[in-house]
Amino acid sequence: MILYPAIDLVGGKAVRLYKGDYAQMTVYSDDPVSVAKEFQKAGAKRMHLVDLEAAKSGIPANADTIRAIAENTDLFLEVGGGIRNMEILETYLSLGVDRAILGTAAVTDPQFLKEAVEKHGDKVAVGVDLKDGFVAIKGWTETSNLTAEAFFEKMQALGVKTVICTDISRDGAMKGTNRELYKALSEKFSIDLIASGGVSSIDDIAALKEMGLHGAIIGKAYYTGAIDLKEALEVAR
């Protein structure tokens, strides 16, 4: 199983939100490039980046930081946040990003998603935020009437290869992952499923690996010291 340590970006800084609430933000580092280098030093091969400002506004606000991480590490970078048209998607790819994650747009603009997958293939992934089994959109502020299962069916039909699945009732709350949900989705669909949100212990990582999940994202648990990245990478391997 592949581990993706994560950096959420606001104003060029590495931050974390509590349960997706922009008012409850903790700044962990003023230098995200050095954080990314620490990931690499610990043995990580990939990382997950989210431009939280772009997730809200649709305008890439941390492009310089993302480019600097791409230029100063050998990590495979996946980036999400506000990718709502081809121009923004291709801007991210031009910064040296290996995979761009479509979130809100995958729900609200299926035509764009279809074109993006046709043009860029597996350089395009989809990030879905789930709240109580339904898809949430617009930086977690709205819930749609689309169930997780119906959403995955659509993605599979469109040829999406990778879906990052976040249970936002658990994200950043250190409550442990929603194992039942991930297990059901990974058994039913042939999509590479990356679990995100609430991965708070080595036990979580071991359990997700046992389910045969493609990957898992580690956020807050790394920054608080609840998970040692080196150990986590060993367990996932």
Predicted regions and their residues:
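Conserved, mostly hydrophobic/aromatic
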Residues: 8, 39, 47, 92, ...
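Conserved anion-binding
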Residues: 19-23, 98-171
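Glycine-rich, proline-tolerant flexible connector loops at the mouths of alpha/beta enzymes
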Residues: 46-62, 104, 165-175
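Conserved beta-strand positions in the central sheet of alpha/beta enzyme cores
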Residues: 48-51, 78, 101-102, 125, ...
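Glycine/small-residue-rich loop that forms an oxyanion/phosphate-binding "nest" at active or ligand-binding sites
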Residues: 53, 61-117
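Charged helix-capping and loop-helix junction motifs
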Residues: 60-67, 141-150, 175-183
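Catalytic cores of alpha/beta
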Residues: 73, 77-96, 180-215
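Glycine-rich phosphate-binding active-site loops on the catalytic face of alpha/beta enzymes
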Residues: 94-112, 198-201, 211-229
